[in-house]
């Protein structure tokens, strides 16, 4: 039974998995012998279109069904590849297998848990059968999309035939980078014995030779994919013996590559130094990559405003009192953050430039306001979305954000719940130690609002000479390509008015 008890939902007539196995498409699994009906194919096409519309900057999605047949003495079988469980996923880590070799599988069973660039999600069994062979073991990191995960067969009697099965590199219907293709082997000399007939979807068999050292010229021969991985991870290929044709370095050879500037032998830490090296999760790598790209490619500028909260706090107290009476104290209390989300959405309706996407060759103004709310989790930052926040009441926003934040910390969010927002709110004021800060824009969005903490301030008063008020500083980060300075100032003026005069949110 799945360990993610999330209610099933229907999208475009298809049943997405409880654990997001299909919601972000590009699934590299094979189809069972049951033929797809015209209606099912149409539904699949509809789902792909819906996902593409929701994630305009994501790579093209596809749901591929490929039947892979037997080779040699192996019976017919299905190859299940690592799927893309989020639009931005490139690599994955197999956290755990929920089934073991020989287990019977029913369509929809939780097959394994995969750590993506966003969260740890479950991958459901694509079809009925028996798990004949697991190719990627638990704990395997940075597995590329399309890499062969496991083998499924229709009959239990066929499981034993795959005991010694190894991945031959044949296509498994995924979308892994096409970089590790070995060159076509030379045509063998004529032989008196006829060669066996080629099998459908069977890759040519290339004898695996012992690693060949590099030539004395110093030139390193490596596949494009291996070079890409080495560059991203700072690995030195000069001392690696390749196992590919002619000594070419493949991605599988990188485990022996030392970091650039490091020696191949393990060195002891200098006496007196005490530290722990923490491996990077896929989520942390993605956060680092995306925020670095955002800060280095988006022309940020910042607008700060101080907002008086006294009237809002009075309205909040009255509304929470009414909610408590009407629901016997069961309703979620409205927080200042809920007012902020609502006011942000309404201000985006007044100033649509702030609710737009930068699409490189054009600007897309979104007609709905989906507010992403930054939530800190043990694994890193994630941004669940309040969809159509401009059209929702404060009580609805309050209950949704509490539920989404809880599931975010438990790692139970599905991709469509945290990808595709149009505006982001990041609130560090609740920690009580932050007066103001600036936040980094989440592309392709144009703005992010940073919320500081509330503090007391003395201001002049005609009656008593001075009075104490409660204020809060907010800073709007804007993309100057889509939001000019004056436009950002107008947005901030509307936002300030909504919070200082909360009744205007009802107009």
Swiss-Prot record:
Its main location: mitochondrion. InterPro entries: 2-oxoA_DH_lipoyl-BS, 2-oxoacid_DH_actylTfrase, Biotin_lipoyl, CAT-like_dom_sf, E2/Pdx1, E3-bd_dom_sf, LAT1, PSBD. The keyword NAD does not apply. It comes from the Eukaryota. CDD domains: lipoyl_domain (cd06849). GO terms for biological process: pyruvate decarboxylation to acetyl-CoA. PROSITE patterns: BIOTINYL_LIPOYL (PS50968), LIPOYL (PS00189), PSBD (PS51826). The gene is dlat-1. The active site is at residues 480, 484. Keywords: Acyltransferase, Lipoyl, Mitochondrion, Repeat, Transferase, Transit peptide. The modification N6-lipoyllysine is found at residue 118. Coiled coil: none annotated. The pyruvate dehydrogenase complex catalyzes the overall conversion of pyruvate to acetyl-CoA and CO(2). It contains multiple copies of three enzymatic components: pyruvate dehydrogenase (E1), dihydrolipoamide acetyltransferase (E2) and lipoamide dehydrogenase (E3). This is Dihydrolipoyllysine-residue acetyltransferase component of pyruvate dehydrogenase complex, mitochondrial. Binds 1 lipoyl cofactor covalently.
